[in-house]
Amino acid sequence: MGFSTEQELVDLFKISFSSKFNIANKRVLEEVSLGFGIADLVVTELKDSAEIVKREKLTSIDINVYQIVKNKKKVSLDVVTTITGIKKQDIIKSLEKLIEYSFVKRMDSYYVFSNKYELSFKKNIAFEAKLRHWKKALMQAYRYKWFADYSYVVLDEAHSKAAIENLPLFEKLNVGLLTISIDGVIKKYYHPKKQKPLDPTMQMLLSEVLMYQ
């Protein structure tokens, strides 16, 4: 006998996961959407509050503009507008905000990278929960590697046999595999290696969500 719903599984996992994951100063987010599906849970280890600068939240446009200036080091307004396809007035608004917060400097008719954005967390772990359909869960969890240091599939233990038999695929994709029983017992079948997230923009989006939720 297994769980009746995925939400039932997620709710119990939230209570029980600390037995397998020792994370200090943690924050737990549900239904996290950053552009590659919706992660059921994201658990982050926050930096000390003294390290987090309080300011107005950066939008996705602000972050995209920041990344362009950072990568190019020196860029004109027209180039940023062309790359993003966003209205010039919105780009100007983002650049003004980035200048105010010292991420960017104005130099004549150009914008120059100034200071690196500091993430609000030390690490984060994404979880995709499923009652069955382990292949679908695996592919979804793999997408979370764009922003997560670690990504896991969490399956109902009652329906996990096929996934366990295909453990080499989890290892190949570096996605962890956990099962949870209806009495809250979590078993870890594969612990992925820490891997640098693939998309800095998505990491920044998550960081902003954490600071301003």
Language-model regions, residue ranges each:
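Acidic-basic catalytic patches of nuclease active cores, encompassing PD-(D/E)XK
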Residues: 1-47, 57-110, 213
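Amphipathic coiled-coil/heptad-repeat helices and related helical stalk/stem segments
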Residues: 91, 137, 162-163
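Short amphipathic alpha-helical boundary/capping segments
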Residues: 52-56
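Short amphipathic alpha-helical segments and helix-helix/interface helices
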Residues: 14, 141, 164-167
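Short hydrophobic-acidic sequence motifs that mark active-site Asp/Glu residues
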Residues: 38, 126-128
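Nucleic-acid nuclease catalytic cores
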Residues: 133, 148-183
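Helix-rich interaction surfaces within compact, conserved domain-sized segments
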Residues: 175-212
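Active-site beta-strand-loop-beta-strand hairpin of nuclease catalytic cores
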Residues: 44-51, 94, 115-126, 134-135, ...
